A protein has these predicted regions:
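NAD(P)-cofactor binding segment of oxidoreductase domains
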Residues: 71-108, 141
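Glycine/proline-rich active-site loop of Rossmann-fold NAD(P)-dependent oxidoreductases
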Residues: 140, 149-151, 161-173, 201-215, ...
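Mid/C-terminal beta-alpha module of Rossmann-like enzyme folds, strongest
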Residues: 198, 205-257, 304-308
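Conserved C-terminal active-site "lid" loop/helix of NAD(P)H-dependent oxidoreductases
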Residues: 230, 250-279
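Amphipathic terminal alpha-helices
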Residues: 283-308
Length: 308
């Protein structure tokens, strides 16, 4: 099936090579789109799947691709998160090698978590980061390391990422999802289609002289998680339990889940969409969930049935 994003994205100049360090959920989507556009793509994974062309890269275990693998790379995206170390794992292991490549654009996927809690107020790229979680502070340190690297770096700050196979649809259908109500609380999100398409758009903007150091990549509509879950139920004609008050649910949450609910912010995408001219593929969760459902149903149809 042809990639529907191909016709809305401009190809990179002839002879370009895109390297994606950490081709997981988001990185694989960019790789598949770029390949569909005829762009030469190199990817790495910590543990590549059997039969995959991805190169193994695991800095924690000193598993690094050979220098020859990076020859001629013109565009690079790192999705690799910080470990518990104080330095970025990519720059620590590949920094000198990357300096030798003809790089025109380097993207680093970070998190809007670096803004911290704004009590539901809007934040832009010009607002100073106020990270409250340790994982966000590590991200912020890596952002600065990339910006100080001397490479043509652009930081892409992402909120919650979703897409086919990673959305509330399956849990809603299975009846295992319990909505939670916390008045005034919203979450921001972005579909993987928009991560991939925005990366390509930003590569072109940079080539044309528009290269802000930090760009928020998120949809137009911050919304309560229960609203998203109700829509997922409506799309599938499934019942959804009544939302449980956050004051009751908090005691049963893991520390990680509690940390997500501890921060409330609305992230602006005005720089990306109004100033840099990007048009969202999925401007809100309704568009994104509809695409997820369509793709997940197509995948179910393609799975061969097993004879009894």
């Amino acid at each position: 099936m042809p990639d529907p994003l191909v016709n809305r994205c401009r190809p990179l100049p002839a002879g370009s090579t895109l390297c994606i360090l950490g081709a997981g959920f988001s990185g694989r989507r960019l790789a598949s789109l770029a390949e569909a556009m005829g762009i030469r793509v190199i990817t790495t994974r910590r543990k590549p799947d059997p039969g995959s062309n991805a190169l193994p890269f695991d800095s924690a275990n000193n598993l690094v691709p050979p220098a020859s693998a990076f020859e001629g790379v013109t565009h690079l995206l790192s999705t690799i998160p910080p470990g518990r170390e104080t330095s970025d794992p990519v720059l620590r292991t590949l920094g000198p090698l990357l300096q030798q490549q003809p790089l025109r654009w380097v993207g680093y996927l970070s998190t809007t978590g670096v803004y911290g809690d704004t009590d539901g107020q809007w934040v832009r790229e010009t607002d100073p980061p106020k990270a409250t979680q340790e994982r966000s502070r590590r991200r912020l340190a890596c952002e600065q390391e990339w910006l100080n690297s001397g490479l043509p770096v652009q930081i892409l700050r992402l909120p919650g990422i979703y897409g086919p196979g990673r959305s509330p649809l399956a849990a809603v259908k299975a009846g295992t999802l319990q909505p939670i109500d916390k008045p005034g609380q919203v979450f921001c999100r972005v579909h993987i289609d928009d991560i991939a398409a925005a990366c390509l758009h930003l590569m072109h903007c940079s080539a044309e002289g528009h290269h802000p150091k930090v760009v928020n990549v998120c949809d137009h509509e911050p919304a309560p998680s229960a609203l998203l879950q109700r829509h997922a139920a409506e799309l599938q004609g499934c019942p959804l339990p009544e939302a449980r008050p956050f004051s009751e649910a908090e005691a049963d949450m893991s520390p990680m889940a509690r940390s997500f609910w501890a921060e409330n912010r609305r992230v602006s995408n005005d720089l990306l969409c109004k100033e840099l001219g990007y048009t969202m593929v999925h401007p809100n969760f309704r568009s994104g969930l509809a695409q997820c459902l369509e793709q997940e149903r197509l995948r179910e149809q393609q799975v061969p049935s097993v004879a009894g």
